[in-house]
Regions:
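Small/polar glycine-rich anion-binding or flexible loop at a beta-alpha turn
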Residues: 162-165, 181-189
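Small-residue helix-packing motif on alpha-helices
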Residues: 60, 179-180
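Conserved beta-strand/loop scaffold segments within soluble protein domains that form the structured core
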Residues: 1-167, 171-174, 192, 197-214
Length: 214
């Protein structure tokens, strides 16, 4: 991507459950350029998907917002990678994953700050939500810092829907299934609002179908 260019790359993928989804997305960003990745990953037997930004120019930026949903017999390994080369570069990665019916969901991120990336800032937030007792969710943020003058932070958390939250919503006249769906919609809301409206509607429909399966 050339100087001062901007690109927002939005995808919502829904593959057949027998597909092996191994694809590569990469952006080389020059001075004052910006790449934004927004992804929803559904379906497939196995997915390995990590959009990458190489921030080569001064003040280049990358933002990533993504969600994946692993159901029965699925192993979805998703996230993003960024390499800071230029000075005063910026990255933000927010990755979320859900798993149910024995699915395996892994959120994996990498932020590398090279020696030349003086003044770089990088923030990572990985959150995973497990929807039953037989599924697996992993959050794996990785940071490599070679520059002393950089600001880097990362968070990772794995949780379940609490019985207290379900009970509270049920006392308000909401069924247990709808209560779970509401909590999931809240969990994925950050991603939905970054998508074009038709993509957001499609993603919400896919989440609804995944919640109904099993």
């Amino acid at each position: 991507m050339k100087k001062n260019s901007r690109l927002k790359f939005s995808t919502v993928e829904s593959w057949s459950k027998n597909v092996f989804n191994l694809n590569t997305k990469r952006a080389y960003v020059e001075e004052d350029g910006a790449i934004e990745w927004v992804t929803g990953s559904f379906g497939s037997r196995i997915s390995m998907l990590y959009p990458m930004g190489i921030l080569a120019g001064a003040r280049a930026k990358m933002e990533y917002t993504g969600v994946s949903f692993a159901g029965a017999e699925q192993n979805l390994d998703t996230g993003a990678k960024v390499v800071h080369i230029g000075p005063n570069t910026y990255s933000m990665m927010m990755a979320k994953s859900l798993s149910k019916d024995g699915g395996i969901s892994t959120t994996r991120t990498l932020a590398k700050i090279c020696k030349t990336a003086v003044g770089a800032k990088s923030y990572t937030d990985c959150k995973s939500l497990i929807l039953d007792d037989k599924s697996i969710s992993n959050a794996i943020p990785e940071v490599k810092v070679e520059c002393d003058d950089a600001e880097v932070s990362h968070e990772a958390s794995v949780g379940k829907i609490s019985d207290e939250a379900i009970y509270y919503l049920k006392t308000r006249g909401i069924s247990e299934d709808e209560a779970r769906a509401m909590i999931v919609r809240g969990f994925t809301g950050d991603i939905s609002k970054e998508l074009p409206i038709e993509y957001a509607m499609e993603m919400n429909n896919l989440i609804k179908l995944e919640m109904q399966n099993g």
